[in-house]
């Protein structure tokens, strides 16, 4: 670039910084620009790997959607528990008025420190979310769910009134306001969403999410969570097999998926994932029904192997660290492993 042009550019940059504040414009190569996106673990080792950065990205919007009872709230509560382990503050905006504090506690959430709001209208919910984000002192904000964000006009109107597009307009306006603040304060904002069926779709997928298209565009990560089967002990159902697909990912390659078990009353089975991923990476040997680690048998059948790892957290942490190292998530292992050791 010739001298005159570089002087003109320097003057323009100086003017922008003077008018809009330091850091409002910078070169991508500057050392001040954070190249690494900070991530919050999801509590699922397989999903952290599928996301490519070791968890959900901070300073971004994330959408988690799926059918009823697929594990959407369980996954978000697990993220909250991981954030609290790192000393972060979490807020849960419960538009569905359905959060069970006892269940949240079982998943490792410190309920006494969790900020909770049960708003009356969609406008109120999104305004509260925006105020929490702008405060800069909340690390993760969860909105449960987009489908329950009812516009004020609909609540105050008659039962049969038509309110086409109101919710979509509300979401579009709120996300325009939220996005810049989320990035500036490095807050992770998670929207839980439900699935609806499009009428008259002959070809392609008839499923769609509620609240219009704005969230699809503004979300950096979109996760599709599904229940694929039941976990049984005899005739009793003790949990559900779950698959999560990374439908959109702006921070790493998308379309990866993770499978894990959600045990009722416990949440995501960390030990179950360690066994599955350990076998896939040949860190754990499987011969018939027996599982072995370093030549030593750890259990016959997955349930017994899971119980062994639960009783020996140091072995579980060792395999966990090896899996993360193999998947280039060594940094994420450093933030979670010590906490889990101290919890035992």
UniProtKB/Swiss-Prot annotation:
ATP binds at residues 66-73. Keywords: ATP-binding, Cytoplasm, DNA damage, DNA recombination, DNA repair, DNA-binding, Nucleotide-binding, SOS response. The keyword Metal-binding does not apply. It is found in: Cytoplasm. Its main location: cytoplasm. One of its GO terms (molecular function) is damaged DNA binding. The keyword ATP-binding applies. It comes from the Bacteria. GO terms for cellular component: cytosol. Transmembrane segments: none annotated. It holds the Pfam family RecA. GO terms for biological process: DNA recombination; DNA repair; SOS response. Can catalyze the hydrolysis of ATP in the presence of single-stranded DNA, the ATP-dependent uptake of single-stranded DNA by duplex DNA, and the ATP-dependent hybridization of homologous single-stranded DNAs. It interacts with LexA causing its activation and leading to its autocatalytic cleavage. Belongs to the RecA family. HAMAP family: RecA. This is Protein RecA. The gene is recA.
């Amino acid at each position: 670039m010739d001298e005159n042009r570089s002087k003109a550019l320097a003057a323009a940059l100086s003017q922008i910084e003077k008018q809009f504040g330091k850091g409002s414009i910078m070169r991508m190569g500057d050392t001040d620009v954070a190249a690494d996106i900070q991530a919050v673990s999801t509590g699922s080792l397989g999903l952290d790997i599928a996301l490519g950065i070791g968890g959900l990205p901070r300073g971004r919007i994330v959408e988690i959607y799926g059918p009823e009872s697929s594990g959407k709230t369980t996954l978000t509560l697990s993220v909250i528990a991981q954030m609290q382990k790192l000393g972060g503050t979490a807020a849960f905006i419960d538009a569905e008025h359905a959060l069970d504090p006892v269940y949240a506690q079982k998943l490792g959430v410190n309920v006494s420190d969790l900020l909770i709001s049960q708003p009356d209208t969609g406008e109120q919910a999104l305004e509260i979310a925006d105020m929490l984000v702008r405060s800069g002192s909340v690390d993760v904000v969860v909105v449960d769910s987009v489908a329950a964000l009812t516009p004020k006009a609909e609540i105050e109107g008659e039962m049969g009134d038509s309110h086409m597009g109101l919710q979509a307009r509300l979401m579009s306006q709120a996300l325009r306001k939220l996005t810049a603040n989320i990035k500036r304060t490095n807050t992770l904002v998670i929207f839980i969403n439900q699935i609806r069926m499009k009428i008259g779709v002959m070809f392609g997928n008839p499923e769609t999410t509620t609240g219009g298209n704005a969230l699809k565009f503004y979300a950096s990560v979109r996760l599709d969570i599904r229940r694929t089967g039941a976990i049984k002990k005899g005739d009793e159902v003790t949990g559900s097999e779950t698959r999560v697909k990374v439908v959109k990912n702006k921070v790493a390659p998308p379309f990866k998926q993770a499978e894990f078990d959600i045990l009722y009353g416990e949440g995501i089975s960390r030990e179950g994932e360690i066994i599955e991923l350990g076998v896939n990476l040949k860190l754990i040997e499987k011969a018939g029904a027996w599982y072995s680690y370093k030549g030593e048998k750890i259990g016959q059948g997955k349930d017994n192997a899971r119980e062994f790892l639960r009783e020996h957290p140091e072995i579980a942490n060792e395999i966990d660290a090896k899996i993360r190292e193999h998947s280039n998530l060594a940094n994420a292992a450093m933030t979670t492993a010590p906490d889990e050791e101290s919890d035992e």
